[in-house]
């Protein structure tokens, strides 16, 4: 562990203490009807503070959604903070995230809807929770790849959590996330995938000078109520944002 990583880890932990007090004085005592929105707002207020610990900066394009469904690619444990720093949101995440140090704690307190994919009946319960969150006017973020990747490609989207989208009646947006490191390889040192283990990965990332995120947003026009076809169309929409960014980057380099 280098000095930068050690110092930032201490700073991160101190910020966690501040965040706990912030939660106790805001979202913890919200009414049942407003608690989900209050938790999303709490994470929104605190995300940027924690991202700064990583030397984090961002570039944003497109219309930032405020409600409805947001469908995004998934790269890292930073994704929830990165999106939440831009707009208050309720996240849908795999149950494993609950066990991540610190970030799992953030996820639980912010009202994340956890899914246990090995339990087939649990998907229906999760879709019901998504509908409840949407009914409150929340923005619900889904990562339909089902896992995080190294940003080389976007995995085919799973259809199980797209039932609320297929039913219609909700605004749908798509987003694409991308990270860059000034002094490293973002695909292995920011993206959290494969055989990486959490704490060594986090310490290494804290030791980097800075992390740069790109977030691209776009509205999605739903033209089908078939989940499989919808999954393909949403995948194509997110992939299009990735390809647009690569074209812009290439043009800039020229």
Identify what each model region corresponds to:
Residues 94, 115, 143, 175-177:
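Generic beta-sheet signal
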Residues 102-104, 152-228, 232-233, 244-248:
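A cross-family acyltransferase "interaction/gating" segment
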Residues 1-59, 105-109, 208:
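A transmembrane-helix-recognition feature enriched in membrane-embedded lipid enzymes
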Residues 250-254:
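Short, low-complexity, charge-dense intrinsically disordered segments
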Residues 67-69, 112, 137-143, 171:
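Residue-level preference for the first positions of well-ordered beta-strands
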Residues 19-35, 53, 66-120:
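Catalytic core of membrane glycerolipid acyltransferases/transacylases, capturing the structured
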Residues 133-162:
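Catalytic-site beta-strand/loop segments enriched in glycine and acidic/polar residues
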């Amino acid at each position: 562990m280098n000095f930068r990583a050690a110092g930032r880890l201490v700073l991160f932990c101190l910020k966690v203490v501040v965040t706990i007090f912030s939660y106790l004085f805001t979202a913890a005592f919200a009414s049942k009807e407003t608690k989900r929105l209050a938790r999303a707002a709490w994470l929104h207020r605190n995300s940027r503070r924690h991202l700064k610990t990583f030397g984090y900066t961002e570039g944003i394009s497109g219309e930032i959604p405020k409600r409805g469904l947001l469908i995004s690619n998934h790269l890292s444990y930073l994704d929830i903070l990165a999106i939440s720093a831009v707009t208050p949101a309720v996240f849908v995440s795999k149950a494993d995230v609950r066990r991540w140090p610190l970030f799992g704690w953030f996820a639980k307190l912010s009202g994340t809807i956890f899914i246990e994919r090995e339990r087939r009946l649990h998907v229906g319960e999760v879709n019901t929770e998504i509908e409840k969150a949407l009914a409150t006017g929340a923005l619900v973020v889904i990562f339909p790849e089902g896992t995080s990747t190294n940003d080389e490609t976007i995995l085919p989207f799973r259809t199980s959590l797209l039932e609320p989208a297929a039913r219609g009646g909700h605004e749908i947006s798509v987003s694409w996330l991308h990270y860059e490191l000034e002094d490293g390889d973002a695909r292995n040192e920011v993206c959290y995938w494969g055989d990486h283990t959490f704490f060594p990965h986090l310490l290494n990332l804290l030791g980097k000078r800075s992390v740069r995120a790109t977030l691209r947003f776009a509205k999605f026009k739903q033209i089908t109520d078939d989940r499989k076809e919808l999954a393909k169309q949403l995948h194509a929409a997110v992939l299009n944002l990735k390809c647009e960014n690569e074209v812009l980057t290439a043009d800039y380099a020229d």
